[in-house]
């Protein structure tokens, strides 16, 4: 269908064509256009708009907020912000807080070991101190999220960790890094469990929080420490450990 430029009329105003008998019917036709069809000849196109008002109410906020699940609590110990936050999700977040704090505690013990004067691997000490701080930040981030959703933070006990990390066959550097790799995989497993709890309780906000704030970073940490383990296995327990330690200081 081709438009014929010479046949197209200009807008003729907004006066609709009256119906038979002079009474205007709905819909109102306000614009008339002409176009040329090669087979059918000249045709008119009329643009119409209905004048029938909308009578149905789409949204009544003052009625909707009367639902019981939207009622604002009055008890002093009840969260005002909590909505669609299952008890299982709240418990899972508290458990993950404990996991992160325990991981931080292990890394802090490793930092103290490598910082000793008779071990003196400052690069390893720096790496494990930063790892400890990172896990603690993760715990604090989870605590903040718990409060955001209207849950209550419950801190569980932190287990005692060893203070000696010497290993006869592997040496302390490789042994400590393999321990760190196992720990990162364990934390990742726990995070995936928290994500499954969110899915099971149909909580997309919590699932998105775990995905965006933790999971990607966790697999990157696993990859990095895996490379450290592979490199330490190559250098052995001797002079190569010192060179690797210097690299961690950079």
From Swiss-Prot:
One of its GO terms (cellular component) is chloroplast. InterPro entries: Ferritin, Ferritin-like, Ferritin-like_diiron, Ferritin-like_SF, Ferritin_CS, Ferritin_DPS_dom. It catalyses: 4 Fe(2+) + O2 + 4 H(+) = 4 Fe(3+) + 2 H2O. Residues 83-236 form the Ferritin-like diiron domain. One of its GO terms (biological process) is intracellular iron ion homeostasis. Fe cation 1 binds at residues 100, 135, 138. Fe cation 2 binds at residues 135, 184, 218. Keywords: Chloroplast, Iron, Iron storage, Metal-binding, Oxidoreductase, Plastid, Transit peptide. It comes from the Eukaryota. PROSITE patterns: FERRITIN_1, FERRITIN_2, FERRITIN_LIKE. One of its GO terms (molecular function) is ferroxidase activity. Its EC number is 1.16.3.1. Residues 50-82 are annotated as: Extension peptide (EP). It is found in: Plastid, Chloroplast. Residues 1-49 form a transit peptide. Pfam families: Ferritin. Coiled coil: none annotated. Stores iron in a soluble, non-toxic, readily available form. Important for iron homeostasis. Has ferroxidase activity. Iron is taken up in the ferrous form and deposited as ferric hydroxides after oxidation. Belongs to the ferritin family. Oligomer of 24 subunits. There are two types of subunits: L (light) chain and H (heavy) chain. The major chain can be light or heavy, depending on the species and tissue type. The functional molecule forms a roughly spherical shell with a diameter of 12 nm and contains a central cavity into which the insoluble mineral iron core is deposited. This is Ferritin, chloroplastic. It comes from Malus baccata var. xiaojinensis.
């Amino acid at each position: 269908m081709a438009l014929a430029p010479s046949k197209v009329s200009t807008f003729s105003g907004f006066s609709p064509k009256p119906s038979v008998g002079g009474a205007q019917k709905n819909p109102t036709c306000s614009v008339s256009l002409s176009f040329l069809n090669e087979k059918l000849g000249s045709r008119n196109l009329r643009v119409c708009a209905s004048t029938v008002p909308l009578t149905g109410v789409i949204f009544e906020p003052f009625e909707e907020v009367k639902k019981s699940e939207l009622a604002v609590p009055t008890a002093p110990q009840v969260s005002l912000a909590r909505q669609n936050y299952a008890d299982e999700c709240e418990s899972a977040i508290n458990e993950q807080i404990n996991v992160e704090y325990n991981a931080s505690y292990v890394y802090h013990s490793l930092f103290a070991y490598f910082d000793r004067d008779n071990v003196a691997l400052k690069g390893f000490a720096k790496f494990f101190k930063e790892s400890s701080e990172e896990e603690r930040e993760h715990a604090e981030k989870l605590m903040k999220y718990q409060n955001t959703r209207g849950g209550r933070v419950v801190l569980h006990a932190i287990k005692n960790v060893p203070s000696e990390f010497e290993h006869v066959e592997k040496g302390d550097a490789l042994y400590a890094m393999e321990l760190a790799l196992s720990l990162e995989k364990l934390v990742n497993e726990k995070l995936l469990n928290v994500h499954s709890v969110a899915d099971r309780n149909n909580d997309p906000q919590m699932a998105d929080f775990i995905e965006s704030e933790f999971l990607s970073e966790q697999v990157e940490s696993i990859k990095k420490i895996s490379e450290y383990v592979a490199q330490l296995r190559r250098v052995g327990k001797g002079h190569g450990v010192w060179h690797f330690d210097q690299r961690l200081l950079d």
